[in-house]
Amino acid sequence: MDLPYYHGRLTKQDCETLLLKEGVDGNFLLRDSESIPGVLCLCVSFKNIVYTYRIFREKHGYYRIQTAEGSPKQVFPSLKELISKFEKPNQGMVVHLLKPIKRTSPSLRWRGLKLELETFVNSNSDYVDVLP
């Protein structure tokens, strides 16, 4: 995913630290859900609390966001369009999205894969698996 505010497998705790560091309402980022595989979390800060909105992948690649109860179901063709919608006030979130918190390094998902590969390559074992 090529969005600068997508942080991959960022933990909830690390997410809260990043968003609350500046103490500004409307800071936001996207991360993978820790509890539901394949679901994204749009996290936004407001009054020193981080609010999390789940984003589900629908049929045909569309995205659906969970907002305030009673709000109509909202579906978007892309994540960029979804974010754009919620940058406007009064759209069903606690606060509109103001400032994306961009990742400063490759998303954790890819960094984790690289670390796994380095661990495998750098193992000090004399045993070598040979594939048929």
Curated annotation (Swiss-Prot):
Which is a Gene Ontology cellular component entry for this protein? cytosol
Q: Name one GO biological process term.
A: innate immune response
Query: What terms describe the molecular function in GO for this protein?
Result: protein-macromolecule adaptor activity
Kindly indicate whether the keyword Phosphoprotein belongs to this entry. Answer: yes
UniProt modified residues of type Phosphotyrosine: Y127
User: Keyword annotations for this protein?
Assistant: Adaptive immunity, Immunity, Innate immunity, Phosphoprotein, SH2 domain
Q: Which residues form the SH2 domain?
A: 5-101
User: What does the subunit comment say?
Assistant: Binds to the phosphorylated receptors CD84, SLAMF1, LY9 and CD244. Does not bind to non-phosphorylated SLAMF1. Interacts with SLAMF7 (via ITSM phosphorylated on 'Tyr-304'). Interacts with Src kinases HCK, LYN, FYN, FGR and LCK (via kinase domains). Interacts (phosphorylated at Tyr-127) with PLCG1.
Q: What is this protein called?
A: SH2 domain-containing protein 1B
Q: Which organism is it from?
A: Homo sapiens
